[in-house]
Amino acid sequence: NITLTQEEIDLLAKIVWLESQGEPTEGQEAVVEVVFNRMASEKYPDTLYDVLSQGNPTQFCSWKNRERANPTEKEYTSIHEVLNGNTHILRNDTLYFSTEPLTPRLDQKIGGHSFCY
């Protein structure tokens, strides 16, 4: 179970907007799930900030541009849908997404992203 402060939700909304603007809602929700899967994984830090800002190479290369983000209600809705358990799209061990599969273990392709475990 993941609980976020409003400040963390605002930060996540910026990253979701930067990483997946123009993607379908399901694609944005899947990006949120990757963040939460990483927080739950022993392979990654357990805080939102640490997952999003993790060093090079970083999954979230948009981190450096976060202050320029302009998230909309769509990003906030996607976050709350995942936080509240209303949607569950990916496997719990899906930890990566990219425009091309990063590993041969493809979970799903949603919009322009491949989600891998």
Predicted features and spans:
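Bacterial extracytoplasmic/cell-wall-associated proteins, especially those involved in peptidoglycan
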Residues: 1-117
